[in-house]
Amino acid sequence: MRILLIVFLSFFAFSDDHDEMYQPGWAEYVYCNVKEGLSDSKATKMFEKRLAAYAEMAEGLDDEVGMVVLYPYYTNEEMRDGADLFFVRHAPTMKALGEHAMTMFAARQENPLPASPLECDNASTAFQRVGPSSGEVTDSFMVDYYPCKYKEGADPVAMRDAQAKFAMEHYANGAQGGYRYIYPADGSPRGDGPDFWFSGSSPNLATWGESTDIFWDKSYGSEAERARWEHMTCESNSTWYGERVHN
């Protein structure tokens, strides 16, 4: 099962038209494993050196593309799909992603990056609808990812409307974070996979735990919280730790 996930927190002003609170975007996912035969210390040094050089190169570009790296925290083998970690590039449009890739390729040809300790064989894209968050973007974060399917007769707009209402209630109760809907696209698994993924993020492990407590103590069972489940079913989540690489 491919983990089609991303965490890119955005802040939006609340309004009465909840579906307009969602910002569309695109993302590219690259799944990686540490090369065999490398010690942990050697791989870490190579990774840090290459990532720093990559970030410096990417920060020099005048575009709206950013990248994060995610590491497994509460997961199992199926949830990881064999990957040690994965990268996500996020952008407002696929054109922006394509232009970024072309520019970075040309820059790497002129100034090669340090050797990588990773093998990255699988990649995919997804369309996202990013919902309102409780605060600003953070450089590190926790994120839960749920694979979901639509129920028969589901209304996606009504589902997102209920989620937006619930999110505002949850934030008002003291929860911190953001969320988004992720729709698999190019390179995604064929067959009977998820219709979409739902991701919910928190600024750090403490706020992640606090938001979980707030959900069960205060937010669970409200009209908006229950209304979400009229349109979807979701399997158990995986939890990942993320760090921002650039932008």
Residue ranges and their predicted role:
Residues 14-107, 116-247:
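Short S/T/G/P-rich N-terminal loop/turn motif that feeds into the first structured element of a domain
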Residues 2-12:
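Sec-dependent N-terminal signal peptides
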Residues 112-113:
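Short, solvent-exposed helix-to-loop capping segments enriched in aromatics
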